[in-house]
UniProtKB/Swiss-Prot annotation:
Family: Belongs to the bacterial ribosomal protein bL21 family.
Source organism, top-level taxon: Bacteria
Protein name per its UniProtKB record: Large ribosomal subunit protein bL21
GO CC list: cytoplasm; ribonucleoprotein complex; ribosome
Subunit relationships: Part of the 50S ribosomal subunit. Contacts protein L20.
Alphabetically ordered keywords of this record: Ribonucleoprotein, Ribosomal protein, RNA-binding, rRNA-binding
InterPro entries registered for this protein in UniProt: bL21-like, bL21-like_sf, Ribosomal_bL21
GO molecular function, one term: structural constituent of ribosome
TM ranges: none
Function in brief: This protein binds to 23S rRNA in the presence of protein L20.
Native organism: Kocuria rhizophila (strain ATCC 9341 / DSM 348 / NBRC 103217 / DC2201)
Gene Ontology biological-process annotations: translation
Length: 103
């Protein structure tokens, strides 16, 4: 089984061909392809972590859809002063399908 550890949106994700992965927003339209940088490659028993070898490894993914994450509520409150502040946040996300790991 071939899998790779890729850097995407400041995080590291373990991916293999055919996986659907949700990442921070990636620039591009649905149906277009993006290339993710590999940090580690495992091909059966062979593990590759050398940066010179990994420069040739291409992990390609197809953008499936853009979406927004769940709403996160942020509440600030100070006792006895009447101060309270409410704020919400939804992360901009992209779902991608890994189409190939070429070493």
């Amino acid at each position: 089984m071939v899998y790779a550890i890729v850097r995407a949106g400041g995080r590291q994700e373990k991916v293999s061909v055919g996986d659907l992965v949700t990442l921070d927003r990636v620039a591009g339209e649905a149906g277009s392809t993006v290339e993710l940088p590999a940090l580690l490659l495992v091909d059966g028993d062979k593990v590759t972590s050398d940066s010179k070898t990994l420069a040739d490894v291409k992990v390609t993914a197809e953008i499936i859809e853009d979406l927004r994450g769940p709403k996160i509520s942020i509440m600030k409150y100070k006792n006895k002063t009447g101060y309270k502040k409410r704020q919400g946040f939804r992360a901009e996300l992209t779902t991608v399908k890994i189409t190939g790991i070429d070493a």
